[in-house]
Every structure is written in C-alpha cells, then in structure tokens.
C-alpha cells in the first residue's frame, strides 16, 4: 500500500493542493536548496523555521533566486507590476500568474506547507529516515574517496550524464537547458540522495551551485520506499 493511499482524505487533499501550487513540489525543493546552503541539521527545526523565516527570503528561495531580491520585496509590498513578464523565469520556469498568486498568498502558503510537512515528518518520513539516512551516511566515505581519486571536475561531471563541463561554463541538458558561467560559481555543493535518480536536480543561488547526486543504497534491511515520496 502506498504512503499516499494510506493518508486520510483531508491529508491527501492538502498534499494534492500543495503539490499543485508548488509545481509537484519543485518550488519547495528550490527553497530547500537555498536554505540548505547553511546546512539543515534538524528536520524538525527546519520545518518550524518555515513559518518564521523572513518572507522575502522565503519567496526568493521559492523562486530559486531567479528573481532579484528587490523585485520580490516590492511584489510582496503590493507592487505586483514589479514582476517583469519578459523575465526568462516566467517563460521557462513558472508562470507569472502562478508567481503572483504565490506572492499574494505567501503567508497562507507558508503555514500550510509547514503544517503538512510537520505531520508528514512525524507520521511517515522520520521512520524511513532512521534507516535510509544512516545508509546515505555510509555512502559518504565512498563518495569522498571517489572525489579524491578523480578530482573535483571529473566528480561533478560523473554526478549525472546530463552534466556537461565546458571551458567557460557548466551546462545541464535538462528539458529546459541550464548553463552557468564558471566565473558566476563561487562554490559547488553535491548532496547525495536516494530519492533523485534517474532525474537531474540542480540549483544555483548567489554563486552556490547545488547538485543532487542520485545513489543506490547498500542493502542492509528491507525498506520499501514508495515512488510517491
């Protein structure tokens, strides 16, 4: 039985609502990428912080740093015309209508995300993490050893077949191709995850490029993980 099918009707309805407004959770993952630059050492504290974080920071992270912080601030203060409809973010990433709706309902969205994630963590994911998290940590030694053997550039390239490193840029051959100039990247963070493969997930905010590397966990015990997680 999948995790979602075991939810009560109200929880499933809330999951579907939040999934829809965050583009199947992609916008929330961008926010997590933004916050994770400062390390998330406690899921409980991170979830609780969603409701108290500065609202400009919240929306800036939701939009993956693709909208200038000043633009986000002006829009939150009521000037929705500050959102430039010709911006690439609205052509390739999120519609301007969705962006305006999220900004207008920012407080309610934050509260509902925080409330749902708290329930999800306590009732579902914390139990899985007790096993999966430990096994992900076990993989770190192998990843560090590989990094030392082949060097940073080759390691990054080998995180996913859609990553292309060129002389002046790093390119990601996704449905909407992404490319970042090397001079715009101050540091690279690679996060290993058992939930990403085979997809490529990347984010670059304020010079910090985050790449999620999908890994296969060593078999230690039988834990079934639903694709819907």
Question: What residue ranges belong to the model's regions?
Answer:
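DNA-contacting interfaces and partner/effector-binding or oligomerization modules
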Residues: 70-208
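Helix-turn-helix DNA-binding segment
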Residues: 227-229
């Amino acid at each position: 039985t999948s995790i979602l099918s075991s939810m009560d009707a109200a929880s499933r309805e809330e999951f579907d609502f939040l999934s829809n407004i965050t583009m199947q959770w992609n916008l929330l993952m961008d926010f997590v990428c933004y916050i994770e630059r400062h390390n998330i050492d406690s899921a409980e504290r991170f979830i609780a912080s969603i409701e108290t974080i500065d609202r400009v920071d919240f929306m800036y992270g939701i939009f993956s740093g693709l909208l200038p912080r000043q633009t986000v601030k002006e829009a939150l203060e009521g000037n929705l015309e500050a959102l430039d409809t010709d911006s690439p973010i609205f052509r390739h990433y999120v519609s301007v209508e969705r962006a305006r709706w999220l900004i207008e309902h920012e407080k309610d969205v934050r509260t509902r995300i925080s409330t749902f994630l708290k329930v999800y963590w306590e009732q579902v994911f914390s139990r899985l993490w007790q096993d999966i998290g430990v096994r992900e940590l076990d993989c770190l030694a192998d990843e560090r050893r590989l990094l030392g053997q082949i060097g940073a550039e080759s390691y990054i390239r080998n995180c996913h077949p859609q990553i292309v490193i060129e002389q002046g840029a790093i390119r990601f051959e996704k449905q909407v191709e992404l490319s970042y100039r090397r001079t715009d990247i101050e540091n690279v963070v690679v996060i290993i995850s058992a939930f990403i493969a085979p997809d490529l997930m990347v984010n670059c905010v304020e010079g910090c490029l985050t790449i999620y590397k999908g890994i296969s966990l060593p078999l230690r015990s039988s834990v079934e993980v639903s694709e819907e997680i």
